[in-house]
Amino acid sequence: MDYSDYTRLDYKTINELFPKGQVSILAAGPGVGKTVFAIQIANQFCRHGENTLYFCLEYDSREIINRLDPVGNGNVRCCINDIPRISLEDILLVIKKRYFSVIIIDYVELMDSIKILDGLNRTDELRKIWMSLDKLAKENDIRIIGVSQLIRIRIDGSEKVLPNKCMNYLDKEFKRDRIRILHREEYYSDCTDCDYLGPVDIITYGNDYSMIYPIKFIK
């Protein structure tokens, strides 16, 4: 994992970007910094007293734990689960045993299929998984944040049309209201040995317009 970091994200911004009662899609290409950003999200929610469950399907749990802030009062606010290929049924079993107001899944494409949906192709499975996660968030009034890896492509310069270029198996309305895209300009440049890590935009697309939350990616 790239041990770069983001500047401190404020709770107000995180609370707006990832509301309760729905699944939020945190999407970016490989190497942009999705996991580091997701850990910062977990840190903020834990710091403000929200019990957080972090499913890390790509990395060892020790890599995640090493980047979590210690909680001053000694209470463990963040639980890490690194069991590979978890399914929606596995998530349901965990949250039945303990309440979590925040669930982060890093990342959803590595989840196992829903057992009752055997026979579907992977694209249809992923659509059902996202819809089921959204239903789970609504029924329990919790935040579910699903990290999603996009195919690395060169964007044509118009970030507003980016949602139309990714995750096309999801309904347009569903995707528009839930997707948050990490966009780092130099990630798409031709410079292969640049050491500069510039600003990162968090782009949202609700209500037919985009909002950009600029943050800083640092070493």
Annotated model-derived regions:
Residues M1-G72:
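The Walker A/P-loop phosphate-binding site
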